[in-house]
UniProtKB/Swiss-Prot annotation:
GO CC annotation, single: cytosol
Residues involved in UMP binding: G55, D76, T137, G138, N139, P140, F141, F142, T143, T144
Record text on subunit structure and interactions: Homohexamer.
Family the UniProt entry places it in: Belongs to the UMP kinase family.
PANTHER family per UniProt: URIDYLATE KINASE (PTHR42833), URIDYLATE KINASE PUMPKIN, CHLOROPLASTIC (PTHR42833:SF4)
GO biological process, one term: 'de novo' CTP biosynthetic process
EC numbers for this chain: 2.7.4.22
Reactions performed catalytically: UMP + ATP = UDP + ADP
Protein location: Cytoplasm
Name of the molecule in the record: Uridylate kinase
Naturally occurring in which organism (per UniProt): Helicobacter pylori (strain HPAG1)
Amino acid sequence: MQAKIKNKRVLVKFSGEALAGDNQFGIDIHVLDHIAKEIKSLVENAIEVGIVIGGGNIIRGVSAAQGGIIRRTSGDYMGMLATVINAVAMQEALEHIGLDTRVQSAIEIKEICESYIYRKAIRHLEKGRVVIFGAGTGNPFFTTDTAATLRAIEIGSDLIIKATKVDGIYDKDPNKFKDAKKLDTLSYNDALIGDIEVMDDTAISLAKDNKLPIVVCNMFKKGNLLQVIKHQQGVFSMVK
């Protein structure tokens, strides 16, 4: 019996580093194509999809500011521009396989994309378009995890999916510790007070205040995003 799809609108957050694949920098076209096909599987199941992508495959504001030459504020703005580069790349990949898309930026770049207007974003989603949100929140000192949570709340998402390289949340890094235990469900408070890395505290607090579930899953496993939407067990962890 096929699992019933319970969510109509979701926001999917990808890290910029994930786009680099096995490289430390840039965009791996094969990864981009894989992500696009995973998103298409959602759209084909009548799911409205928003996307936020980090910029760490190009530059991270915190890292750029560590040398003392570039101020943190400027470094963060540089990072925001990097997310727009990734957003345009994702737009191209999605449109290449037949999806209708829009990129909306929190910083005005009218020659490349729309400026972010939440009512317009919702209208695009209702018309079946995938909306990719770039430039973070438009403000320095906020992560793209926080931006993703904010956009998810603004557009009325049923949940936010953080697509990563692991299949959920663990009590310690599963890539370093063989005895790491997967946590299928945990509370917002547990995610905030523990040493478990899910999202930054601002993002988790925002999700908690607005009762927005956070799902962590493996983006590289084919069909996994759709499985998450169908609420199949064992392929993700949830904070709620």
